[in-house]
A protein has these predicted regions:
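Solvent-exposed, amphipathic alpha-helical segments
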Residues: 23, 41-45, 107-114
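Charge-rich, acidic-biased intrinsically disordered regions
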Residues: 49-65, 98-99
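Long, intrinsically disordered, low-complexity Ser/Thr/Pro-rich regulatory/activation regions
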Residues: 100-120
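Short, amphipathic alpha-helical "recognition" segments used to contact nucleic acids or chromatin
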Residues: 36-56
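Accessory, typically intrinsically disordered or conformationally flexible segments
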Residues: 1-33, 37, 57-75, 86-89, ...
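Short Lys/Arg-enriched helix C-cap and helix-to-coil transition segments
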Residues: 55-57, 85-104
Length: 304
């Protein structure tokens, strides 16, 4: 009982929320920065004579004997520091990667820089794993195989890659097309349209949608807010294209019409619309990543 009273007295040291929050923020930051500092110190041990008096011949031997870190763990800590620390050699993360944590950054080590630039700390580990799976899947196809792929005729008639991605997403996910059609028809202006599209395509406030375009490869559409440009990333080349919401409205002008979403879809894709699954209750945790639909899993592909 005396111990509980003692803890209670200590708790009184935080006289207000601001003091408590400042302390909490400091502790959390120390935990987040710990792994990058470990990588930095391991590099110091590797690159300087600091271990000379220790009796250890290598940094791997030192880390194993003193801290139980095997060779792969040492390599991972160092790689994270190389890639994400300030200047590639510092005890502190670059600003844009603070708050990520070791688990997320370990996955991001396997992603190209042009994709990592689009990932915020709000992306979950499973979101980043989904992005990694998309990149890994695209890596299975060689550049020569891309050149040999038969392109959809419609791709040459559309004006830009944003229109091509939206066309493909609509074909692959008729439910998405129907939701977007409804909001496009209701929107009075591009600002309203942008807000409604964000609610549909990025309800968590940001998100990525992947579509595979034959003859081009995977393109990932990054949405970060109704007041920010859309970014279209070529997974293979790293090329980034920026579009405004007026460009998305122009794409919908081309891809949507008729008196109903189903009639519009069938006109655009020249096929009978597949059965649309009933709307499911929203899960407690909203994914920020929508992977590409593969042709073999898409009943709508190849009908037109």
């Amino acid at each position: 009982m005396g111990e509980l009273i003692e803890y209670g007295k200590k708790a009184l040291e935080y006289g207000n929320y601001a003091d408590f929050k400042q302390t909490m923020d400091t502790v959390v930051e120390e935990v987040e920065e710990g792994f990058v500092k470990i990588g930095y110190l391991l590099k110091v041990a590797r690159d300087t004579a600091v271990l000379q008096e220790s009796g250890y011949a290598t940094v791997n031997e030192f880390a194993e004997k003193e801290y139980g870190l095997d060779k792969s763990a040492v390599s991972r800590f160092i790689a994270i520091n190389d890639r994400f620390a300030e200047g590639g050699y510092a005890p502190r993360l670059q600003e844009q990667y603070r708050g990520m944590g070791r688990a997320k950054l370990s996955i991001m080590l396997m992603l190209p820089e042009w994709i990592n630039e689009e990932i915020s700390p709000d992306y979950s580990k499973s979101d980043i794993q989904a992005i990694r799976a998309e990149v890994a899947e695209e890596e299975k196809t060689t550049d020569l195989e891309i050149l040999m792929e038969e392109r959809e005729d419609i791709y040459d008639r559309l004006e830009n890659d944003l229109q091509r991605v939206l066309w493909k997403l609509g074909q692959d996910i008729p439910e998405l097309y129907c939701k977007l059609w409804k909001e496009y028809m209701r929107a009075d202006n591009v600002e309203q349209l942008a807000k409604e599209v964000m609610e549909i395509m990025a309800p968590a406030g940001e998100g990525m949608h992947s579509a595979r375009i034959s003859g081009i490869g995977r393109l990932m559409l990054s949405l970060k807010g109704a007041d920010r440009d859309l970014v279209l990333i070529n997974v293979r080349s790293g090329e980034k294209q920026r579009y405004g919401w007026d460009d998305m409205e122009a794409a919908f002008d081309l891809l949507m019409g008729s008196d109903s979403a189903e009639e519009s879809w069938e006109t655009v894709y020249g096929a009978e619309m597949p059965g649309v699954a009933p709307v499911q209750p929203e899960s407690r945790k909203t994914s920020r990543v929508s992977p590409a639909v593969m042709e073999e899993n898409n009943p709508a592909a190849g009908q037109n």
